[in-house]
From Swiss-Prot:
Keywords: Ribonucleoprotein, Ribosomal protein
Transmembrane region(s): none
Lineage: Bacteria, Bacillati, Bacillota, Bacilli, Bacillales
This protein's encoding gene: rplL
Name of a matching Pfam family: Ribosomal_L12
One of the record's GO cellular component terms: cytosolic large ribosomal subunit
Similarity section: Belongs to the bacterial ribosomal protein bL12 family.
NCBIfam families (UniProt xref): L12
Protein name per the record: Large ribosomal subunit protein bL12
SUPFAM superfamilies: ClpS-like, Ribosomal protein L7/12, oligomerisation (N-terminal) domain
Highest taxon, organism lineage: Bacteria
Subunit: Homodimer. Part of the ribosomal stalk of the 50S ribosomal subunit. Forms a multimeric L10(L12)X complex, where L10 forms an elongated spine to which 2 to 4 L12 dimers bind in a sequential fashion. Binds GTP-bound translation factors.
Amino acid sequence: MTNEEMISAIKEMSVLELNDLVKAIEEEFGVTAAAPVAAAGAAGGAVEEEKTEFDVVLTSAGASKIKVVKAVREITGLGLKDAKDLVDNAPKPIKEGVSKEEAEEVQGKLEEAGASVEVK
């Protein structure tokens, strides 16, 4: 039987006959007709997880608070008092809506100074 003959035979089937055919194929080959739809949904979820903007959040200043305050001033351009207040009131966002590269750079500087940082 050629592909064209199979397609012609399928075209002539009723909905009930097509349903039975699908069930028979699923049982014969151990597959489900719903699997491709589920796989497409999972792939769509993976695309949504791909973020383009990140927030860098200072979770803790750690033991060397002075170094962290200096790093925060350098990163944000804040004055000494504002940077100290931000560090004292952690967890606080340091940078919001930045690229992945910038977020990793900021995270590296803060962790180097002794801070605990989270990128969201």
